[in-house]
């Protein structure tokens, strides 16, 4: 993200320290992908979009944190998990006011994303009140994400729950 609210290397290290991992397991966060819908970085955006699509199709991606404008672009393009179905009851209740709902072409409404404004990455950093930060950042889970239990754990970590 352009404000470095979600620095992958730091999040990877901090989150991994909260997990019990075997030698074969590792936590990977990738912030090298960049989607610019304004056309400023069109070649890089196309490459990032292709990589993101490939990760989703191969079911190698657990979640994405992105701006409101990129979520708006992807919400009707990529199938996303319904967070109300994915989250356990206690987490669903705690995060209910942060859910972002979308109605698809068939009229089905699902919780496709989660507003990250009150997460440890944004709240209290000043970014949540900074007028220069022009986007809201959302967490979404592509359909077929391979590690749903880790998604739940990461959200608990993100919101201190």
Summary of predicted features, one role per range:
Residues 133-147:
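A bilobed periplasmic-binding-protein/Venus flytrap-type ligand-binding module shared by bacterial periplasmic
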Residues 146-157:
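Short amphipathic alpha-helical coupling segments at ligand-binding clamshell hinges
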Residues 2, 33, 87, 143-145:
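Short, flexible loop/turn elements at secondary-structure junctions
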């Amino acid at each position: 993200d352009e404000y470095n609210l979600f620095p992958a290397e730091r999040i990877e290290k901090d989150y991994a320290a909260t997990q019990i991992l075997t030698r074969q397991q590792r936590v990977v966060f990738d912030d090298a992908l960049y989607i610019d819908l304004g056309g400023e970085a069109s070649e890089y955006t196309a490459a990032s979009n292709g990589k993101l699509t490939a990760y989703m199709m191969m079911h190698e991606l657990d979640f994405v944190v992105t701006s409101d404008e990129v979520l708006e672009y992807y919400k009707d393009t990529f199938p996303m998990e319904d967070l109300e179905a994915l989250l356990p009851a206690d987490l669903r209740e705690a995060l209910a006011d942060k859910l972002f709902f979308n109605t698809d072409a068939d009229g089905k409404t699902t919780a496709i994303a989660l507003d990250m404004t009150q997460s440890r990455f944004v709240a209290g950093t000043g970014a949540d009140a900074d007028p220069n930060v022009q986007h809201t950042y959302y967490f979404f889970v592509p359909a077929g994400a391979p590690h749903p239990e880790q998604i739940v754990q990461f959200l608990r970590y993100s919101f201190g729950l």
